[in-house]
């Protein structure tokens, strides 16, 4: 059994990573050090980071540069222990308006700029279907920086086979590419009770055949 990414930082209401504010940077350092110790206790390799809200009053490229600088600082704290920060782009249309990080190409650009084995991407297929689609080509383009996947169908964010995403093809594709990481079931169930639990199991069996 492998523990998937735990949430280390995901304050949706704060302009955090996009700033140069010294107090924010000290807060992030503290969070990273706490995260490293938590990961050691539970034996976890990945820690999820959402870089917070974007700043309406600051040019976008400056925000990107600030995010990169802050993540470099965070990655330096995590590297000695082997903890990997995984950035999660989230959709702005259905669930999380106002956030800085929304797309896989954007996360890829940031990870490449940070240039650390402790800064990677968790590709949430549900969110990215809403934000950009083009799922398999984006997986291929960002492959070197993807450390984990979150799963859920769209619309509805229930188990695979309940929406429009072809998980069977996605699973085949990442298996062919040699993926051996975690697949995190971050979704609800289309049915309640025991029948709903059976439906989830059957859905994954169907997609993994």
What do these predicted ranges mean?
Residues 1-17:
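Short hydrophobic interaction/assembly module
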Residues 4-7, 48, 86, 147-150, ...:
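Conserved beta-strand positions in the central sheet of alpha/beta enzyme cores
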Residues 15-120, 130:
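Active-site acidic/histidine proton-transfer and metal-coordination neighborhood
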């Amino acid at each position: 059994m492998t523990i998937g990414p735990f949430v280390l930082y995901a304050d949706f209401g704060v302009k955090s990573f996009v700033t140069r504010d010294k107090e924010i940077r000290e807060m992030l350092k503290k969070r990273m050090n706490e995260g490293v110790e938590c990961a050691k206790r539970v034996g976890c390799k990945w820690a999820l980071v959402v870089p917070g809200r974007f700043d309406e009053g600051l040019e976008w490229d400056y925000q990107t540069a600030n995010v990169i600088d802050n993540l470099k600082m965070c990655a330096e704290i995590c590297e000695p222990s082997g903890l990997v920060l995984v950035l999660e782009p989230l959709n702005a249309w259905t669930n999380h308006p106002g956030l800085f990080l929304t797309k896989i190409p954007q996360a890829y650009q940031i990870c490449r700029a940070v240039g650390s084995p402790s800064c990677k991407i968790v590709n949430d297929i549900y969110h990215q279907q809403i934000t950009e689609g083009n799922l398999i080509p984006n997986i291929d383009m960002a492959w070197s920086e993807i450390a984990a996947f979150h799963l859920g169908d769209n619309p509805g964010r229930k188990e695979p086979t309940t929406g429009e995403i072809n998980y069977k093809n996605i699973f085949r594709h990442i298996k062919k590419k040699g993926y051996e990481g975690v697949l995190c079931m971050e979704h609800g169930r289309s049915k309640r009770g025991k029948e709903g639990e059976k439906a989830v199991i059957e859905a994954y069996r169907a997609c993994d055949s």
